[in-house]
From Swiss-Prot:
It is found in: Cell membrane. It is a multi-pass membrane protein. Residues 1-114, 160-649 are cytoplasmic. This is Archaeal Lon protease. The active site is at S550, K593.
Length: 649
């Protein structure tokens, strides 16, 4: 399984602390992103959730210091005395140091009533001293001088009080502190700034609302209400925007302007705010743009913006099941255990994680790269090993679907994560909402479904296989075909809503009629007038939307059975698509469908030969691969009991 032998992950070396070394399966994408950043090119990363888009950007952010020299800078906001609604924002190279020269001198304020009272008491005490201790010949001069000092001092106090009151009554009065520049941002190393596309204020900046009108002396001046956006904080660095599906069109226009002009002003975003009338000068924002999203998110971007993205990278969601890649997956397991302080995992547990990676990839020779999902399974298996039940596990999911385990405080009693713990998490589906819904549906509805495996042969009755939604759970569908004499021949589909399914059933009907009419099948010949046959096809007890072409072979065989009145054996289930030449084509979800056939108790399952490379488990049921419809006919028709077969049930 792995190139190294071990009993538990405790014996394995610790993973590298560098994120760039912890990226699994996306090495080519990492090289391209590094090259793009080095050459100052814009990048968009597309791929399934959990394949490592954000991790790649974080890993690149850790080594930004290696991309040449960087000049630190800081951003300050100053008032514009000519127009207070147009504050000035400056980007200044160097490290920020608050200069005492920038501190404005405060206006002299009128003394308080307490100060005046103390001055009066002091004057009275001074007068008492002079009257009591000074000689009579100096008394008149001393009193005169004291009176003049008190008079001058009182005049100054009254004058400053009057001027202060008159200044306070002015509508545009500015306190000197309101003239002081404000530090908005200080950048000491090359920045990597992350922002979500839906948060316009965080991305583009804003002007805060002032309930007092935004004008001194009561209000806060505009330059003190500026919120710098991520687009400006990323100056001389990287701006990483995720969730591009939620990006409004107006935000795309602003980003496009910033990419073109390398500068962008900040204005009030809320038209009902006092900041709506405020706009700064254009602020430098020369950055490298990296965006990420799912595959279909790219269609929400404007063409001019998409044209300015130099590298469009699609991340892989699978990798080949080789010894080298299994070792990488083992490295990932060790990383998760180390980073989340989990219990060690046994060798069998690691092998079970690899098996689950095969299932999630849908093939025996592939391993999934949806590593966030695997990480959730590993963390939940750790909790199962510690004795937690399902309800406790479900309570540790966050809004984004990521699982956060509780760390084990007491490790005196060593606990190991085994294959049984990992398998329990996977089989119960607690890592996926869709799988839980599908499992509950099957559990509650299975006893009502009229499916009788290994029953007597029947005419026009066959069992097909399907996968329920996105949960990855297979199910068995009973298909019934009935032929009626009619003047208006045709094919009628019951309980089928998907367009692909309708087209595939039409193909199956046409192919079955062609084969019966040409009498080329290895079956008893029978003259049939197809011009007066009305065909009804029912997917029995199917209440959800049915789509896809994997039931084409099953429907074709059921129609042939009904037309020729030859019974079909009931000990098998079948899946596979067909072309008009009768070739059996590959389908998806083959492992889930085989599991469904085993769960219902069928002895055999027939699948396309092209899907044999995808089959993971072969025990418990006979798996028959086929290439053409001619190979299937001898396997499924009961030619010995034609007369006594049931029509349908």
């Amino acid at each position: 399984m792995f190139s190294i032998k071990f009993k538990t992950t405790e014996e394995l070396p610790e993973p590298s602390p560098r994120l760039i070394d912890q990226v699994i399966g996306q090495e080519e994408a990492v090289k391209i992103v590094l090259s793009a950043v080095k050459n100052k090119r814009n990048v968009i990363l597309l791929g399934d959730p959990g394949v490592g888009k954000s991790m790649i950007v974080k890993a690149v952010g850790e080594i930004l210091s290696d991309f040449g020299e960087f000049t630190p800078y800081y951003v300050i906001a100053k008032p514009n005395l000519k127009n207070m609604e147009r504050p000035i924002v400056e980007v200044i190279d160097g490290e920020y140091k608050e200069d005492s020269k920038d501190m404005p001198k405060l206006d002299f304020k009128a003394p308080s009533s307490t100060t005046l009272l103390l001055i009066m008491i002091g004057a009275i005490l001074l007068s008492e001293y002079l009257l009591k201790y000074l000689p009579q010949n100096y008394l008149l001069a001393a009193v005169t001088i004291t009176a003049l000092i008190v008079l001058i001092f009182g005049f100054v106090i009254i004058l400053t009080s009057i001027m202060g009151a008159s200044r306070a009554s002015m509508p545009n009065n500015l306190n000197p502190m309101d003239l002081k520049p404000v530090l908005l941002y200080e950048c000491k190393k090359r920045p990597l700034v992350r922002a979500s596309a839906y948060n316009v204020t965080r991305l583009l900046g804003d002007i805060k609302h002032c309930p007092l009108g935004g004008r001194p002396p009561l209000g806060t001046p505009p330059h003190k209400r500026i919120i710098l956006g991520a687009i400006h904080e990323a100056h001389r660095g990287i701006l990483y925007v995720d969730e591009i599906k939620t990006m409004p069109l107006e935000v795309q226009d602003y980003i496009l302007t910033a990419l073109q002009d390398k500068q962008l002003p900040i204005s009030g975003r809320n038209p009902n705010s006092s900041g709506a009338t405020v706009e700064t000068n254009p602020i430098p924002c020369d950055f490298i743009l990296i965006m990420s999203g799912n595959m279909d998110d790219v269609y929400n971007l404007r063409a001019p913006l998409l044209d300015r993205i130099d590298y469009k990278i699609v991340l892989k969601n699978k990798m080949d099941n080789t010894l080298e890649n299994r070792d990488k997956l083992l490295q990932f397991i060790v990383q998760e255990i180390k980073n989340n302080n989990l219990n060690p995992m046994t060798y069998d547990g690691c092998c079970e994680v690899v098996r689950i990676a095969q299932y999630l990839a849908g093939s025996k020779d592939k391993l999934t790269l949806r590593l966030r999902l695997l990480a959730n399974i590993i963390k939940m298996a750790n909790d199962v090993a510690m004795g937690k039940d399902v309800e406790e596990l479900l309570g540790n999911f966050d809004d984004k679907g990521e699982y956060h385990p509780e760390t084990q405080k007491d490790k005196s009693n060593k606990v190991y994560i085994t294959a049984e713990h990992v398998r329990k998490v996977f089989d119960t589906g607690i890592y996926s909402m869709e799988k839980q819904v599908a499992l509950n549906y099957i559990k509650n509805f299975k006893r009502y479904k009229h499916i009788v495996p290994n029953d007597e042969p029947k005419v026009g009755v066959i069992y097909g296989l399907a996968v329920l939604g996105a949960g990855g759970i297979g199910d068995v569908t009973k298909i019934i075909v009935q032929i009626l004499e009619s003047k208006n021949p045709g094919t009628h589909l019951l309980n089928i809503s998907g367009d692909i399914a309708k087209h595939s059933i039409t193909l199956a009907s046409a192919l079955s009629k062609k084969l019966v009419a040409e009498k080329k099948l290895p079956l008893p010949k029978k003259d049939i007038d197809l011009n007066n046959k009305e065909i009804y096809i029912q997917f029995s007890q199917s209440y959800s939307k049915i789509d896809g072409d994997s039931a084409t072979a099953a429907v074709c065989l059921a129609i042939i059975s009904a037309l020729l009145d030859i019974p079909l054996k009931q000990d098998f289930a079948i899946t596979g698509s067909l072309d008009l030449s009768g070739n059996v084509l590959a389908i998806g979800g083959v492992n889930e469908k085989i599991e469904a056939a085993k769960r219902y108790g069928f002895k055999r399952v027939i699948i396309p030969e092209a899907n044999m490379i995808d089959v993971i488990e072969t025990e418990g049921i006979e798996i028959i691969p086929v290439k053409t419809l001619d190979e299937i006919v001898p396997l499924v028709f009961d030619l010995d009991n034609r007369g006594g077969a049931e029509r349908f049930n």
